[in-house]
């Protein structure tokens, strides 16, 4: 049994177009805000109530950053899996501040577009920062043969060219 688990799963809507920045060595980092909502009926008044939570999501995975940059826009519905991390920083007056974020990096991250793209297709990416000096560094890309139900992007992926979708026919389950 594992000693501990740090996994966050969210389904929500993107509140604004994602912000993409680059590190000094050119690696992309995507920042986005995702809203999740819950609704209920007030027992006393019978009135419908809604509570919205805003979550900051940071994507370090290069393949997933490409998908975010190309296909994710304000209003998009996303399914994400990542890890919860709190970082400490100082504001302009020197006071310590803390930010809790959902971080997508490495092989344990997932980003799935649930409502497809504007053209009706979905994005799919192998993605992944495999480290070292191999040729796999940037990962997947968009697979135009993916289903119109939306795309799925896994953090741990496959080499750059991807695999053909017809390989699914050989899976025995």
From Swiss-Prot:
Coiled coil: none annotated. One of its GO terms (cellular component) is nucleoid. Residues 5-111 form the SSB domain. A motif (Important for interaction with partner proteins) lies at residues 168-173. The gene is ssb. Residues 119-142 have a biased composition (Gly residues). It comes from the Bacteria. Homotetramer. GO terms for biological process: DNA recombination; DNA repair; DNA replication. PROSITE patterns: SSB (PS50935). This is Single-stranded DNA-binding protein. Keywords: DNA damage, DNA recombination, DNA repair, DNA replication, DNA-binding. Plays an important role in DNA replication, recombination and repair. Binds to ssDNA and to an array of partner proteins to recruit them to their sites of action during DNA metabolism. HAMAP family: SSB. Residues 114-173 are annotated as: Disordered. InterPro entries: NA-bd_OB-fold, Primosome_PriB/ssb, ssDNA-bd. Pfam families: SSB. NCBIfam families: PRK06341.1, ssb. GO terms for molecular function: single-stranded DNA binding.
């Amino acid at each position: 049994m594992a000693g501990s688990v740090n996994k966050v799963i969210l389904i929500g809507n993107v509140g604004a177009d994602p912000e993409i920045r680059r590190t000094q060595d050119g690696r992309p980092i995507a920042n986005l805000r995702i809203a999740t909502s819950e609704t209920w009926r007030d027992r006393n008044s019978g009135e419908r109530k809604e509570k919205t939570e805003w979550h900051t999501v940071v994507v370090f995975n290069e393949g997933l950053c490409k998908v975010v940059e190309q296909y994710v826009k304000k209003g998009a519905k996303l399914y994400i899996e990542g890890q919860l991390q709190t970082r400490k920083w100082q504001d302009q007056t020197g006071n310590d501040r803390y930010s809790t974020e959902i971080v997508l990096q490495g092989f344990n991250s997932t980003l799935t577009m649930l409502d497809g793209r504007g053209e009706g297709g979905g994005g799919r990416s192998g993605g992944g920062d495999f480290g070292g000096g191999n040729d796999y560094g940037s990962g997947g890309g968009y697979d135009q043969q993916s289903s119109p139900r939306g795309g799925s992007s896994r953090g741990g992926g496959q080499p750059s060219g991807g695999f053909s979708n017809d390989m699914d026919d050989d899976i025995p389950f």
